[in-house]
């Protein structure tokens, strides 16, 4: 009986630790904190340049994108790409849709490019 209570207590503690870690992760990868607005725009321009042929030279965009990404904790990189592809958050915290919404004719290609970056097919 004591073993059963100890197991339940251990499980409860483990779940509490996991919940706290999950909340901490979500709070850390928030635009305006660890993810800067400048870094989101640098990645947007690079992704669009790679797939649509717009903006500055590819090498300059790649360098800017990588420089900005290096300032963000690695655990936030996937969140950065998700924000880039799925929504845009202004400095005021307003969600404005996708950062690539204005590039609708290239959106499918850009999504495929971003998926390749994170290792998905």
UniProtKB/Swiss-Prot annotation:
Specify the protein name: Trypsin/alpha-amylase inhibitor CMX1/CMX3
Q: Which Pfam families match?
A: Tryp_alpha_amyl
Keyword Secreted applies: yes
| Subcellular localization | Secreted
Which GO cellular component term is one of those annotated? extracellular region
GO MF terms here are: serine-type endopeptidase inhibitor activity
> Do the record's keywords include Secreted?
yes
- Signal peptide positions on this chain: 1-24
Which key words tag this protein in UniProt? Protease inhibitor, Secreted, Serine protease inhibitor, Signal
Hey, which family's this protein in?
Belongs to the protease inhibitor I6 (cereal trypsin/alpha-amylase inhibitor) family.
Provide the disulphide bond pattern: none
